[in-house]
Curated annotation (Swiss-Prot):
The gene is snf8. The keyword Membrane applies. It is found in: Cytoplasm; Endosome membrane. PANTHER family: EAP30 SUBUNIT OF ELL COMPLEX (PTHR12806), VACUOLAR-SORTING PROTEIN SNF8 (PTHR12806:SF0). The lineage of its organism: Eukaryota, Amoebozoa, Evosea, Eumycetozoa, Dictyostelia. Residues 8-34 form a coiled coil. Belongs to the SNF8 family. It comes from Dictyostelium discoideum (Social amoeba). This is Vacuolar-sorting protein SNF8. It is a peripheral membrane protein. GO terms for biological process: protein targeting; protein transport to vacuole involved in ubiquitin-dependent protein catabolic process via the multivesicular body sorting pathway.
Amino acid sequence: MRRGIGIQAAQKQTQTQKQLQNVSEQLNTENINKIKEQLLVFKENLEIFATKHKKDIIKNPEFRKYFQDMCNMIGVDPLASNKGFWCQVLGVGDFYYTLGVQIIEICLKYRSSNGGLMEMDTLAEHLRKLRGKNSQEISCDDIECSISKLKVLGNGFNIIKVSGGKKLVQSVPCELNKDHTDIIILAQDNNASITQSLVISKLKWSEERINNVINFLLQESMIWIDEQSNETIYWFPSLWSNFSFE
């Protein structure tokens, strides 16, 4: 008798679990549908907002960044295609793709001098000169947005964060590991240069580890050698502030 009660209890428990699972699946489906409806409404409102504030989005970099952030919230990419609503209303696709071409042009022009590394602010300055005074104003956010689209071309373009909130634009198809970026950050804090003794003192690295990084950076033409002092100095021209290679 007890065994029968046990079987009935187990069956009832299984049935209850199935009912709870069905209710859970139903709730999940309803929640997903509600979220989809909300996103659709948000997208429609975003299109109305874009139409209403078209001039501000096109002319004001900060407003354009705000608009881009709103798009990212709902997974809308106004730069994904040169066709469709966003490009027709705002022309943002053409704007960022044109900016991307100009970024490539400048990075290629100075690659032999800086080894494919350039400070973001320096790149922005070159872009403003190239575009002219009467062109649409750009910001570093615009540059980052364009570079994110250039990644479809491969690993040639990347953004490296260094100390002091500064950023470097990498335009060479090589992968920089943590050792490479640690050296760059150290150089950025030391007037754009490093020495072997400085690296040993600050990073506690072995000579072999230092030489491996230096040889790689030399091979990629990212650093220059200065042997005029008692100890060899390695300079990063990409970190020289307000330096022009023209």
